[in-house]
């Protein structure tokens, strides 16, 4: 009989301990985080964000400039190929004005219309002749934060060119490829029917931190260079 009472007493103690443990767990779960803990976590997250965001912005900025420089280099390669394949003139038309988004585009000389037309335009008509910097729908816009320019740099990136300057202006309105009048705020590298540039020249792009140059000589060799925007430190890219 005494043994039964002891066993019952032990079971009661165990049951009370279990109930107490469950109550403790519930109280801990209901308590949540204190205000100090929340503030500490927010402070840590703020510090991490402050460290990470500028780096991410630099990556995006570099990617935009790199991408535009690569694309304008590809446009030059396409223009050179078009000129040789079609036995006509071809050019990369680069708009550097500030009244609208800056852009570049490949044009070809149409021997039927005797005017420049956008490359890839099916069945061009007289109304498609390029005489101004108006957009045609075949442009590649420069990325946000990227523009044509070279800052204060004056040292040439290569002996392909003799000065740091955008290539010569684009011709329009003439009866031959290199006649008419030059379109304001434009820069063109033109290839003749043999695929050679009519003159050495280059395109310069900057984001204010770095400058990219894509230059060509009269033999048709093209190279890309990059430099810090503040001090000339050109190296091949």
Language-model segments: residues:
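N-terminal helix-rich module
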Residues: 2-25, 33-36, 47-77, 81, ...
């Amino acid at each position: 009989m005494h043994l039964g009472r002891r066993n019952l007493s032990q079971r009661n103690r165990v049951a009370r301990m279990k109930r107490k443990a469950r109550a403790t767990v519930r109280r801990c779960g209901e308590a949540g985080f204190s205000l100090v803990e929340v503030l500490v976590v927010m402070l840590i997250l703020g510090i991490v964000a402050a460290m990470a965001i500028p780096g991410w912005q630099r990556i995006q900025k570099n990617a935009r400039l790199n991408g535009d420089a690569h694309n304008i280099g590809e446009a030059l390669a396409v223009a050179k190929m078009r000129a040789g394949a079609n036995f006509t003139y071809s050019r990369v038309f680069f708009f550097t004005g500030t009244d609208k988004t800056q852009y570049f585009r490949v044009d070809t000389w149409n021997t039927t219309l005797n005017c420049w037309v956008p490359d890839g335009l099916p069945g061009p008509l007289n109304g498609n002749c390029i005489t101004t910097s108006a957009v045609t729908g075949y442009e590649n816009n420069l990325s946000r934060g990227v523009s044509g320019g070279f800052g204060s740099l004056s040292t040439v990136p290569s002996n392909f060119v003799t000065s740091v300057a955008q290539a010569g202006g684009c011709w329009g309105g003439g009866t031959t490829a290199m006649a008419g009048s030059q379109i304001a705020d434009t820069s063109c590298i033109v290839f003749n029917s043999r695929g050679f540039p009519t003159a050495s020249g280059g395109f310069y792009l900057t984001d204010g931190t770095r400058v990219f140059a894509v230059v060509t000589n009269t033999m048709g060799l093209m190279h890309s260079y990059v430099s810090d925007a503040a001090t000339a430190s050109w190296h091949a890219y």
